[in-house]
């Protein structure tokens, strides 16, 4: 974005903020008759100047996740609850069928010790565990990043490699294909087993399928959600009825055939 573009953006921001301030002032002038409703200003997708997230229609992004700036999410991928993908200083690319689980953080590097400008690149069918941190690194297809693991600037996790839960992968570390690394700092532990390799692929598929169910539920409006509650309440059976039914179906209570 050039100087003129930034100037127009700033003017637009000031106008919006001024309008909101006038609205608040008008409400207060109504005295005891005014009503103030607290609204969340959280935006799942947020641009940073001219950088706007690009999410495929077939991907799922949880409503309380945050994607900002230059972020691309491929088809069938899922960004779960509480995740933050912040592409404000550089780009983040997430391939197809990848799942980034709850509370994970993906960021980029504009400056670091090596002086390199580093994006974060995540391939296809990758599993990123809960509360993991990825910063200016590359993760190839069908790799597995464990829960609460940290992968730092310039690190490269190759295809079918695994970073164990809680591990810290230091800057510019390369984890070869088919290896498991763990510890702080992360070191080679052993080779990936065939069962684990199959699990990497199946985990990505299972999360992709689960994301579709969550996307359907999150897409429902208030009326649809309330109707579903009423329907469930109407069809619910009384616990006393269930207890009587259980007594009747005990083997000793089932009448014998003549």
From Swiss-Prot:
It is a peripheral membrane protein. Zn(2+) binds at residues 107, 130, 135. It is an enzyme of class 4 (lyase). It is found in: Mitochondrion membrane. Keywords: Lyase, Membrane, Metal-binding, Mitochondrion, Transit peptide, Zinc. The keyword Transit peptide applies. One of its GO terms (molecular function) is carbonate dehydratase activity. Enzyme involved in the catabolism of H(2)CO(3) but that does not mediates the reversible hydration of carbon dioxide. Mediates complex I assembly in mitochondria and respiration. This is Gamma carbonic anhydrase 3, mitochondrial. The lineage of its organism: Eukaryota, Viridiplantae, Streptophyta, Embryophyta, Tracheophyta. The gene is GAMMACA3.
């Amino acid at each position: 974005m050039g100087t003129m573009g930034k100037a127009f953006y700033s003017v637009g921001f000031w106008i919006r903020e001024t309008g909101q301030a006038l609205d608040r002032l008008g409400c207060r002038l109504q005295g005891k008759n005014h009503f103030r409703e607290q609204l969340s200003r959280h935006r799942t997708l947020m641009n940073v100047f001219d950088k706007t997230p690009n999410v495929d229609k077939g991907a799922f992004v949880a409503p309380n996740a945050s994607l900002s700036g230059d972020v691309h999410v491929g088809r069938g991928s899922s960004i779960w609850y509480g995740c933050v993908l912040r592409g404000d200083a550089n780009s983040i690319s997430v391939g197809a069928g990848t799942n980034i689980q709850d509370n994970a953080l993906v960021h980029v590097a504009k400056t670091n010790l090596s002086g390199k400008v580093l994006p974060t690149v995540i391939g296809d069918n990758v599993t990123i565990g809960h509360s993991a941190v990825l910063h200016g690194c590359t993760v190839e297809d069908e790799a597995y990043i464990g829960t609460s693991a940290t992968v730092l600037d310039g690190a490269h996790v190759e295809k079918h490699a695994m970073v164990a839960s809680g591990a810290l992968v230091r800057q510019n570390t390369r984890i070869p294909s088919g290896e498991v690394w763990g510890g702080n700092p992360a070191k080679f532990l052993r080779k990936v087993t065939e069962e684990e390799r199959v699990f990497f692929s199946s985990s990505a598929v299972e999360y992709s399928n689960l994301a579709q169910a969550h996307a359907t539920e999150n897409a429902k409006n208030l009326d649809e959600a309330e109707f579903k509650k009423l329907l469930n309440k109407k069809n619910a059976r009384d616990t006393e009825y269930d207890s009587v039914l259980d007594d009747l179906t005990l083997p000793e209570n089932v009448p014998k055939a003549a």
